[in-house]
Structures are given as C-alpha cells and as structure tokens.
Design a protein with these regions (language model features):
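Charge-enriched, short contiguous segments at helix-coil
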Residues: 182-278
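Alpha-helical structural motif
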Residues: 8, 74-77, 81, 179, ...
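A structural signal for well-ordered alpha-helices, especially hydrophobic packing surfaces
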Residues: 37, 82-89, 108-112, 212-222, ...
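Charged alpha-helical initiation segments
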Residues: 10-95
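Amphipathic alpha-helical interface elements
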Residues: 66-185, 270
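Residue-level detector of alpha-helical secondary structure
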Residues: 2-17, 23, 27-34, 50, ...
C-alpha cells in the first residue's frame, strides 16, 4: 500500500478515536456495527432462539395436557390458550395469565352448558337431594340419595337469588360462575356427591371463581365490581402462590371433565326415571 494511503488511514483512525460522532458516522457509511451493537444483536438473537425453544416445549406440554380430552373440536383452541397462559406466566403478567387460563375454563364450560343432555339432566335433577347416602351397608350410587334432606342440588350449586326461575331455565342462561359450579357437580362429581365432598367442592369452585374475578384486572376501561376488587386485593399480593393454585385448579377441572364425560349417559338414564322436583 502506498505511504500516502497509509497516512490517510492513520489520520482517519485518529479522528475516530478523538471524535465519537465521526466514528459513528463513518461506521454507518461503511455498514459496520460496533462490538457493543454486535453483542446486543447476539443477545437478542439468543433470546429469540430461547423463546422459540420454550414455545415448542410448552406447546408439547399443552398437547399432552389435553391429550384424551373428550371434546376434540375444542383442543386446538385450548392448546393455544394454554400456550398464551404460560407465556404470560413467564412474563409475570398475572392479569393476562388469569385471562388466558379462564378462557380455557370458559370454552369448556360454555360448550358443556350448550350440551342438550347436560341441560336435560340439570332441569330434571335440580330438585334432587344434593348428596348421596354413605351408610356402611349401602353402595355409593346416584340412585341412593338422601331423600329425607331438603338440601337440593339447586341449593348447593345455584346462588340464592331467583333460584326457582334459574332451575327452570336453560343452563346457558346461568351466570358464568354458576355454569362452572354446575359442570363441576355433574361431571366432576358425576352427580354422586357425598356430604364429605362438600369441602373439596367448595375449594375447587372458589378457586375457579377467583380466576373469573381476576380475569379482567389488566383491562383498561373495564370497571371492576366490588367482588372483583376484593378478590384482586386478596390475591395479587400473593400472586406467586396463586400462579400455582390457579394452575392446580385448571388441572383438576380438566381432569374432572375427562373422567366424568363417560358418565353422562348413566346420569341421563337416571334423570329420565325420576320425577322432577322444584
């Protein structure tokens, strides 16, 4: 290389060292990135690869979670919502996590409550005693109910206001939380709930209600009800715990549906034999 050219290069290098703006502009003209920029691009790319790998793992987990789910037409939507739920959990976006989780519960519940068989069963059985007999010599059966008890299925599952009108209406007209409680009773407990099952029923339905109350906590413009505000104020300070509690509630709910689905036929046959009570 000629000495003049080498001298010019040396001058340019000195200018770059002395003047950061000149250095930056020269790099732009030559399409050269700094080592710091290279590092940032590298980190961003690594994060993208990491997130992609995580998404693949989570999608496989979601597909396994919904493996064997009886309503196959819902599985693709449920898997997508599950993946969104886990994405928001990684980002510690609790409100969005609750919404994505609740959308899975809502999808399943609304589908079941539009099922003519479940609607028929509920209308005929609302007036039946809520619990079956658990005597020593009596087998646990949907037919062996505590008929001396005035505590009906409707009294257990539905909220107290307008309970008679609700029991005569379709399941689709119930409130969101009443629909969930209905599904848990008829599929989760296969309409064969014992007195000793009350606490577990209360625990799962309370958690599912908490998820419902927290689902809109991040939505702008949506005014929280008094019940939603109380639930959020109770839950949010302990959100690290409730991530796990809510995931546990979703797991139990879905497992109950998987197990209870095959019992719908037997429950319907029992409902056909009885005289509906109000």
């Amino acid at each position: 290389m000629e000495d003049k050219l080498q001298t010019t290069i040396d001058k340019i290098l000195r200018l770059c060292a002395q003047n950061p703006d000149f250095d930056s502009e020269l790099r732009k003209k030559l399409n050269i990135v700094t080592s710091n920029e290279t590092l940032l691009i590298g980190d961003e790319r690594i994060n993208q690869i990491y997130e992609y790998c995580l998404e693949r793992v989570v999608r496989k987990q979601a597909e396994d979670f919904y493996s064997g789910f009886p309503m196959q037409e819902l599985v693709n939507v449920l898997v997508d919502d599950y993946c969104r739920m886990e994405f928001f959990r990684r980002k510690d976006a609790f409100g969005d996590f609750c919404l994505a989780l609740y959308q899975q519960i809502e999808c399943v519940t609304n589908n079941l409550c539009s099922n003519p068989d479940l609607d028929y069963i509920a209308k005929r059985m609302w007036g039946c005693p809520a619990y079956v007999i658990t005597a020593k010599d009596t087998p646990i059966s949907i037919e062996n109910r505590r008929y001396e008890s005035a505590y009906s299925i409707a009294s257990l599952v539905l909220y107290k206001n307008n309970i008679i009108e609700k029991s005569m209406s379709s399941l689709q007209s119930l409130s969101a939380t009443e629909k969930v409680r209905t599904v848990v009773y008829y599929l989760g407990y296969k309409a064969t709930m014992r007195n000793v099952d009350y606490e577990s029923y209360k625990e799962i339905t309370s958690l599912l209600t908490d998820i419902y109350q927290c689902r809109n906590m991040n939505h702008r413009g949506s005014k929280q009800t008094e019940w939603e505000e109380k639930a959020i104020n109770r839950i949010f300070p302990q959100k690290a715990v409730y991530y796990h509690k809510f995931l546990g509630a979703l797991t139990l709910f879905i497992e109950q549906i998987k197990e209870g689905w095959s019992s719908l036929g037997d429950i319907k046959r029992y409902a056909e034999k009885i005289t509906p009570k109000t």
